[in-house]
Each structure stands twice: as structure tokens, then as C-alpha cells.
A protein has these predicted regions:
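Canonical Radical SAM [4Fe-4S] cluster-binding loop centered on the CxxxCxxC motif
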Residues: 1-20
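Residue-level detector of structured alpha->beta connecting loops
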Residues: 5, 93, 134, 164-165
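Short secondary-structure boundary/capping segments
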Residues: 18, 55-61, 114-118, 152-157, ...
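Conserved SAM/AdoMet-binding glycine-rich loop
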Residues: 23-138, 143-145
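Flexible glycine/acidic-rich beta-alpha junction loops that bind and position SAM and/or redox cofactors
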Residues: 51, 108-114, 146-151, 163-200
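Catalytic cores of alpha/beta
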Residues: 85-89, 146-162
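Conserved catalytic-core segments centered on acid/base and nucleophilic motifs
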Residues: 137, 142-145, 157-161, 167
Length: 200
């Protein structure tokens, strides 16, 4: 997608740490964290895509139970949701919700940002399957995307809520390395920008 910068630093293959090391580091960090929000953030653009992700998810959930950390895990689940991704979300349902991101429901906006959402029927089926397994879900929508209007964004929120989904809304950010950060992209879509303070 034009707003995303995952992998832009190297454009190369990702190397995995050994599974045993990952699990031990999760156990170590969760047993010692002083993070008052008890939030764990996974920096994986497609969590649930690999078979080993089930073991990682199980370790995170077990640590949440044993160490009371994490209470919440922020996860970017694999975009092409399949049975494994649902199993991973089910393993972690005590410490996370499954994001079923849309960004927008407007077809021309999706084209502008080079994104294709899963078909509506597949989205509905996925939502029902998650509900059946006790997995809470939410959808993410981004306001300010190229071609999005106030009316089309509100329409997207209403449509998403009617699908019985919680909605998380974010502003479009320009991230260095993403296509929408380029001067050409800003000029093509007449993007006006402002700076904002990011609390740390």
C-alpha cells in the first residue's frame, strides 16, 4: 500500500531468529517488564503466516496468564487471512483482538493507495468465524487518504459498524520510505500536510 513502509529499509528477505530464542525472550521480557500499560507490540507485518507463529502466540498467551503481562498485544495479522491466522488469533484471544483492516471502503480511494480489501462476503464469513471462536475483532479505517471525502469516510464508518465491528480510526501519516511520502505522490493527490506532536 502507498502509505506503508514495511520492508522499505532493505527490500530483502527477512531472517528469522530461532524459535527457542524467540520464546525465551518473550518469557524473559514479560516476567521483567515495568511497562504500566502491560502492552506488547509485535513488529511483524504478517503475524500468523508462518506455522511457528502458533508457538509464538501460545507463548505470549501463556505469559499473559502467568506473568499478567501482556494484558494487551498489538498485532499486525497476515493480510491473507486463512485458518492458521484464525488459529493464532484464537490462541491469543485473551491478550489481543483481531484487526480486520479496511483502511477505506471507497474503491477509488483503495485504488489510489494501491490496496485491495478482502471481498465483503469473505469479510463477513471471517467476522462470523471469529465471533464463533470468541475472538474479538475490530476494523481500522484511515481518514485523509487520497480521494477520501468526509461523506465517503462517514459512509465507511457506518458500513463497518453495520457489520457489527468496532472501529479504530487513524489519520493518514506520511512515513519516510512509503510512496505517499514522496513529493510526486503529494502533488498528484494535492496532499496538504501538517506536523503534530507525538507523545512519548
Amino acid at each position: 500500500c502507498s502509505f506503508c513502509a514495511w520492508g522499505s529499509a532493505t527490500q530483502s528477505k527477512v531472517r528469522q531468529f530461532p524459535l527457542e530464542q524467540v520464546v525465551e525472550e518473550i518469557k524473559y521480557a514479560t516476567a521483567r517488564s515495568a511497562n504500566p500499560q502491560k502492552l506488547l507490540y509485535l513488529a511483524d507485518a504478517n503475524f500468523g503466516m508462518l506455522k511457528r507463529d502458533e508457538d509464538i502466540a501460545r507463548a505470549i498467551a501463556e505469559c499473559g496468564e502467568k506473568n499478567k503481562f501482556p494484558k494487551q498485544t498489538y498485532v499486525y495479522f497476515a493480510k491473507n487471512t486463512n485458518e492458521r491466522v484464525i488459529r493464532v488469533a484464537e490462541l491469543m484471544k485473551s491478550v489481543t483482538s483481531m484487526s480486520m483492516s479496511k483502511q477505506s471502503v471507497n474503491e477509488s480511494v483503495l485504488e489510489n493507495i494501491k490496496r485491495k480489501n478482502i471481498p465483503h462476503q469473505q469479510y463477513d464469513n471471517l467476522s462470523l468465524e471469529c465471533e464463533k471462536r470468541g475472538i474479538t475483532t475490530f476494523s481500522e479505517l484511515i481518514y485523509g487518504l487520497p480521494g477520501e471525502t468526509y461523506e465517503s469516510f462517514v459512509h465507511g464508518v457506518i458500513q463497518t459498524v453495520r457489520q457489527k465491528a468496532s472501529v479504530a480510526m487513524y489519520p493518514m501519516l506520511l512515513i519516510e520510505g512509503a510512496e505517499n511520502f514522496t513529493v510526486e505522490h503529494r502533488q498528484e493527490f494535492d496532499i496538504k500536510t501538517k506536523y503534530r506532536i507525538l507523545p512519548r
